[in-house]
Regions:
Chain A
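Helix-loop-helix "hairpin" substructures at the membrane interface of multi-pass membrane proteins
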Residues: 103-111, 117-122, 174-248
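Inter-helical junctions in multi-pass inner-membrane proteins, predominant
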Residues: 35-48, 148-151, 171-173, 193-199, ...
Length: 333, 503, 324
């Protein structure tokens, strides 16, 4: 970024401060309340946390770009499930099995292609019909989930490939495969958003769509690209996760859109578009996962996490508004 | 004017939308080094014509020539590539991006892999900013700039190509006088370089000050081009509206009653300080000042939309506390707001429902709203204000600006207020409706209403007011009676030059 | 003249297209399979749509007021679980008002956040979706909730009973729809909801207390949710914690299908009812045609997009979006 002024620093620092508070809280509270003897800040525990952040995290990174654009994608959970079904099912096809190890890249490719195609359908509809992305993806969230169920009924789709499992469980420089995927995606998207014309145009479009149109930026194709990107990332998230688990239920990925959006909003991206940062979203993702693990660590019901995250999301919104108030002179509307 | 061959020529442009012929064979030519005014009432087709020229609309018929070459403006870039650039009325900037990114919006310099060439971007931007002599740099966030500086960014954007023609669409709408001077300097500079300028504005003084020729549109068709030096305001107006307009300052005087509203030492944070004035029944008090002088904020405070930090408001001699518009309405204060579409009307609602909105809670029989009572109110003000609409079911968004404004006025008259505040009564309204609304305001005063008119247009203030309060930077500089006021001392007062400040 | 009648026709389709589509849809399905318009079938469809329908009525108020409510699904789970739990503890006669009270408190909380604190409704209700889900799980300890003595209670009337042959869920849906329809179209409150959703600033400038109106729309929504929870609990007399999960989006789909704009200021109760029925009959019609149950999701998707698309296409006068 070329211009970082003070308010930007506060905004982008807030999520990391929040993470620090969480770490401190759970470490101290854990000493008194923890059900196990393990310390919370244990490096192994933290590495696991990063790995567990990956599935939602990779989607949330894509969601950041879509939301900076001023759009939203509610269908990511369904795309995630559909890609997973294609991934695992395709590995069981007879001709694929005859390929041996080569079936892996092909099934990966098919799964990723599925994500891109489903994303492209969303993008094309948004572009060509002019219907709001919220409605378009609300619809396709239902529709794509329908496709998942039609594919295999209510049965889980399973295929365990040990080569894949080994790959997914491998560690490089201490980090799990999934963590590497998360970090590499974050790095690439960060470069895209801060250094490339496409990224800067994404901000411009979200900031002032009419101005972007007037300046000759082709907004429609731009949207299409970003929906394809988030479709791709949803599929990538599925590929990373299901390579290891090997079995997908047709209901998997439900509510992922809500988790991803929560992470993006916690990271400070504006709902109206035009402002946001990839790195802060990464912070949002980690903060949520930390909360999940931390609450478990201090022996609180795992279900409480929903309650806490919901209230924190609202609190963040409230604080943000208080910070942006102009004081008593403001118009009472 | 030297008679050179035109740099830009529009020939017989026709543009039809479903149900409307927005442009009906319009022709226009622009010579190098001239400032060419394009005038017409709202809806006359100016914007459509410029959108055709800018490649945002495709004409159904007609040709566009740049120099001798015919050009098809199929997309916004085509216009720019041909040296035709636009400075839009509504700022089209991305607040969160830097000045440089905004100036080169849509054409950021690229390196390999789609990367932005920041170095080139900043060098190019600085070169342009130097030419404009502005006090900000390429890396400043646009959201941090003042409106006038944002306008300069828009102008800088036009200079990224070596333009042959620059189109200014209502550029002075939100500028202060000193900022206007800077703008006119830029225009003069363009002119001296042989660039042609199309200047769209409603403001006659500006038109006569800086333009060489004036072309007029009415109802989508071309009505003629005049040499500015050989014409006057009346002729242009006649061409625009098809008839003569009475702009005389003579108004019928009438009896005034007691003081209806008194404001004592009212302040609201940094917006305005220590403001005192009175309005009598049957009197029109005009508030005149520059944009940002605090006039609208005073009106909003009296109407309960802002919390005063000090001071009193008295109605009929009684001190009142007003914490919300509901309070204000209950005490007989009405506000016709500045932003008609944003604050005055629910555009998707029909005429009647808009008009009865403030009192819908009272227009009931039993628990239900009374159709009869509502229609009765609509009919009354429909007739009284001569609102032209096919019927009350018409959606307000489909009416013309003038009729929309009358709906808002009707809405507040139907509340039978003691004090009626009208903020920018004729902004964005065509000339014909303007004078109707001026007459209406005078009539209301004659009927005994206490009226406050807030306006940025001097002729309007002079025309309708019995007394004028001049404001500058949140303070009342001076009060004028009709006898005292001259254009000169009024301008001095609102520029902060007046010595004899009346507290 | 031809142009006028054409404009009139497209205007009519824009306004009433959903009703025309509904009629065409019913006729086609009726021809394809006469059982479709069998009275028992129709009654069955309406009955199974009633819970969704009751929730959609409340959300219609919220959406017309210019906001969203994504919390209704998890709120419905909450009220179902609570009323089932209290049924055995304090008896149905007290359990029902207690559950209504608690659900209305949730609605009031959301209304306070969105109305008085002016927070973004999408995020607030998204947060509340999660928070209320957590609340329900904490309340139930994650267990399913069942009424101990399923035969010895009159509590099942709201979900299973009937009056002169009309199932009570249908009756409740119909009465509530009629009542709320009148509130929306014939009262000052209804008009204010339209004004606040159509242009909130203009509403405030007209002396309408926007915060209070928004607050009340959420209160109405939570009332409808409590009603739906009651019907759900009474129908099954036992429930999972997640009984309402995902319903928020189906509800929203019904409201949008009915033609309410997410920007606020437009929509009617009648059209929402049509939207609910379309969703119900699609599901039923596809089943009768022998299609997989889940095909309805895909069809619903296509129908929602088409409905909204044609609506805005009629308004802008061209089919495809002008954005390049």
């Amino acid at each position: 970024m070329s211009n970082i002024n003070r308010t930007d620093l506060i905004k982008q620092g807030a999520i990391w401060a929040f993470i620090a508070v969480e770490l401190a809280f759970f470490s101290i509270a854990g000493k008194f309340l923890s059900v196990t003897d393990a310390t919370f800040m244990d490096p192994e525990n933290m590495l696991l946390l990063l790995k567990q952040s990956a599935p939602i995290g990779i989607i949330a990174l894509g969601m950041t770009i879509v939301m900076i654009n001023g759009n939203i994608d509610l269908s990511v959970g369904a795309i995630f499930a559909m890609s997973a079904v294609i991934l695992l099912d395709s590995m069981g096809w007879a001709w694929m099995q005859s390929l041996g190890v080569w079936s892996i890249p092909i099934s990966w490719g098919l799964a990723l292609l599925t994500g891109v195609v489903l994303g492209a359908i969303n993008g094309l509809i948004v572009w060509k019909t002019g219907v709001d992305a919220f409605i378009v993806t609300l619809g396709s969230m239902l529709g794509y989930r329908g496709l998942v169920f039609m594919y295999n009924g209510e049965q889980p789709t399973s295929h365990l490939n040990w080569t894949l499992v080994d790959f997914a469980e491998a560690r490089f420089l201490g980090l799990h495969t999934a963590t590497w995927f998360l970090l590499v995606v974050a790095l690439i998207l960060w470069l895209v958003m801060t250094r490339t014309v496409h990224g800067r145009n994404a901000y411009a479009i979200g900031n002032n769509r009419e101005a972007a149109v007037n300046a000759g930026i082709r907004v429609g194709p731009h949207f299409l690209w970003n929906f394809m990107l988030i479709g791709f990332l949803s599929a990538l998230s599925a590929v990373v996760f299901y390579s290891e688990s090997g079995s997908v239920n047709p209901n998997d990925g439900m509510l992922y859109e809500l988790w991803a959006i929560t992470a993006v909003v916690l990271g400070g991206t504006k709902l109206t578009g035009g402002y946001g940062s990839i790195i802060s979203t990464l912070g949002g993702v980690i903060a949520i996962q930390l909360l999940r693990k931390g609450l478990g660590h201090i022996g609180s019901d795992t279900e409480t996490v929903n309650l806490v995250i919901g209230l924190i999301l609202i609190a963040v919104l409230f604080l943000d508004r208080q910070l942006n108030r102009k004081g008593k002179e403001e118009l009472r509307v | 004017m030297t008679d050179q061959s035109p740099i830009l020529r529009l020939e017989n442009i026709v543009k039809a939308f479903p149900g409307v012929r927005a442009l009906d064979g319009v022709s226009l030519d622009l010579r190098p080094g001239e400032v060419h005014a394009l005038m017409g009432e709202n809806g006359a087709g100016k914007s459509t014509l410029m959108k055709v020229l800018g490649g945002l609309h495709q004409p159904n018929e007609g040709k566009i020539y740049i120099g001798e070459k015919q050009v098809v403006m199929d997309r916004p870039q085509t216009a720019k590539q041909n040296g035709v650039v636009f400075i839009h009325q509504e700022l089209s900037l991305a607040d969160e991006l830097s000045v440089a990114e905004n100036i080169f919006l849509g054409e950021l310099p690229r390196k390999s892999l789609g990367r932005v060439d920041w170095e080139k971007l900043y060098t190019d931007t600085d070169a342009i900013l130097d030419r404009l002599n502005v006090g900000f740099n390429a890396r400043t966030r646009v959201g941090d700039l003042s409106i006038a500086n944002q306008q300069m960014v828009e102008i800088a954007r036009a200079l990224t190509v070596d333009p042959r023609a620059v189109i200014f669409d209502e550029p002075t709408a939100s500028l202060t006088d000193s900022e206007k001077v800077v703008l006119f300097d830029v225009i003069a500079d363009l002119q001296s370089r042989g660039v042609g300028v199309i200047y769209i504005s409603h403001r006659m003084e500006e038109i006569f000050k800086i333009t060489d020729r004036i072309s007029v549109l009415r109802d989508g068709s071309y009505r003629g081009t005049l040499n500015t030096a050989e014409t006057n305001e009346e002729d242009v107006t006649q061409l625009m509206i098809g008839r003569k307009l009475d702009l005389s300052r003579n108004k019928v005087q009438h009896e005034m009653g007691d003081v209806a509203l008194e404001v004592r030492n009212l302040s609201c944070g940094k917006l305005f300080h220590d403001v005192s004035f009175t309005v009598r029944k049957g009197e029109v008090v005009g508030f005149y000042g520059l944009v940002g002088a605090g006039r609208t904020e005073i009106a909003e405070t009296i109407f309960g939309l802002r919390e005063p930090s000090a001071g009193k408001i008295l109605l009929d001699g009684q001190e009142v506390t007003i914490n919300s518009p509901q309070d204000a309405i209950a005490r007989g204060i009405s506000l016709v707001p500045e932003d008609r579409k944003g604050q005055g009307l629910v555009l998707g609602m029909n005429c009647r429902d808009n008009m009865t909105l403030p009192q819908i809670g009272e227009l009931t029989s039993g628990p239900f709203t009374s159709d009869k009572a509502e229609v009765a109110i609509f009919d009354k003000y429909h007739d009284a204000l001569d609102i032209r609409t096919p019927g009350w079911r018409q959606t307000v968004g489909n009416l013309s600006g003038g009729n929309q404004q009358k709906i808002v006025i009707g809405k507040w008259l139907s509340m039978h207020p003691k004090v009626l505040i009208v903020d920018e009564p004729t902004r964005g309204i065509d000339v014909g409706s303007k004078s109707e609304i001026h007459n209406l305001i005078r009539d209301l005063a004659a009927q005994g209403y206490a009226v406050i008119v807030v306006s940025s247009e001097m002729p309007e203030v002079l025309h309708v007011s019995d007394r004028i309060v001049a404001m500058f930077s949140g303070r009342v500089m001076r009060e004028f009676t009709t006898e005292e006021v001259t254009e000169n001392n009024l301008v001095q007062a609102i520029s902060g030059l007046s010595e004899d400040r009346v507290a | 003249m031809a142009e006028i009648s054409k404009a009139g026709l497209s205007g009519f389709l824009a306004r009433q297209g959903i009703i025309v589509a509904f009629a065409v849809f019913m006729i086609v399905f009726a021809i394809a399979n006469p059982r479709f318009i069998d009275i028992d079938n129709i009654s069955g469809v309406i009955r199974s749509s009633a819970i969704l329908g009751v929730m959609a009525l409340g959300v219609t108020f919220v959406v017309i007021g210019g906001n969203l409510d994504l919390s209704v699904g998890s709120m419905m789970s909450f009220s179902t679980i609570v009323v089932l739990d209290l049924h055995d503890k304090i008896g149905p006669a007290l359990a029902i008002p207690a559950m209504f009270g608690m659900t209305l408190c949730l609605g009031a909380f959301i209304g306070f956040l969105v109305g008085y604190l002016k927070l973004n409704s999408l995020i607030v209700t998204l947060g509340m979706l999660s928070a209320i889900h957590g609340l329900t799980l904490t309340y139930s300890g994650g267990q399913n909730m069942d009424i101990a003595d399923k035969r010895g209670t009159w509590f099942n009337v709201f979900g299973q009973g009937d009056i002169i042959g009309i199932p009570i869920p249908i009756l409740m849906f119909a009465l509530l729809a009629a009542g709320l329809g009148v509130v929306l179209s014939r009262t000052a409150f209804g008009r204010k909801v339209y004004a606040v959703g159509g242009n909130g600033t203009a509403a405030v400038f007209s002396g309408i207390p926007r915060a209070r109106i928004v607050f009340l729309t959420y209160l109405m929504s939570s009332f409808c949710v409590a009603m739906a929870g009651l019907m759900q609990a009474s129908r099954s007399l036992g429930s999972q914690n997640t009984v309402g999960q995902g319903l928020e989006l189906e509800v929203l789909a019904a409201v949008i299908l009915g033609g309410a704009s997410l920007l606020g200021g437009s929509g009617t109760i009648f059209k929402t009812v049509i939207g609910v029925l379309i969703l119900g009959f699609i599901q039923n019609g596809l089943l009768l045609m022998g299609l997989a149950f889940y095909a309805q999701y895909v069809v619903t998707w296509v129908i929602i997009i088409l409905a909204v698309w044609l609506d805005i296409a009629a308004k802008r006068g061209r089919l495809l979006s002008p954005i390049a």
